[in-house]
Amino acid sequence: MFALVVPPYPVNVAVQTISPTKYCFQFENRVQAKEFTLFLTDIQKFTPGYNAAIYLAYQPFTDWKYLGFINSNKPSIICKIPSETLDNNNNNNNNNNNNNNINNGFINNINSIIPTEIIQIGISIETDLEIQSKPPIEQQQQQQQQQQQQQNTSSTSINNFIKTEEFKQVAFKLCDNLVNYILSFSTSNNTVPSSSINKWYENFQKKLKNDQLDFLK
């Protein structure tokens, strides 16, 4: 009923029946394949309104990632293989997420010696309503990336605002220092010599060179 293709291996039809609604493939990913294809071998036997939900897990097969589904209208699918590192990192963050960390009855049902780097592909027969209630792991990762980008954008905007406010404060203090300096040269006629501006600028350059701009802090 099901067939699995993991490049460059040949087609695998040795699906193991766990229960009337649970099936499982397993393979050793020696070539570090990035994706696999799963398809129905007999579409007519697949009941309309039901789907084959596809899950993937690494040892110890307690963190099942939902990857997508196939049915009579969609008899095949190409799924990306999530990295084991990514699975382990997400495990602690998703313990309470039923869409992301699912035990579908595949655990401990394969009576064989489990080599290292083994991957299990679990297949669970589920209704349309069950399928609609859970997004695939790839879609969840995209949503997480979008949320992270939004957070980064928000942080950048806040930092830019802070820098703008700091610049305004420095500009105000600089102008205030200039005005006070010039007014110190004012005469009884309320005039100031133009040379006072040049003197202020020369003093400012000296302070800037010697890092003596405490009045701007």
Curated annotation (Swiss-Prot):
GO MF, any single term: nuclear import signal receptor activity
InterPro entries, alphabetized: Hikeshi-like_C (IPR048364), Hikeshi-like_N (IPR008493), OPI10 (IPR031318)
UniProt similarity note: Belongs to the OPI10 family.
GO cellular component assignments: cytosol; nucleus
Name of the protein: Protein OPI10 homolog
Disulphide-bonded residues: none
Domain of life: Eukaryota
Pfam families, per the entry: Hikeshi-like_C (PF21057), Hikeshi-like_N (PF05603)
GO-annotated biological processes: protein import into nucleus
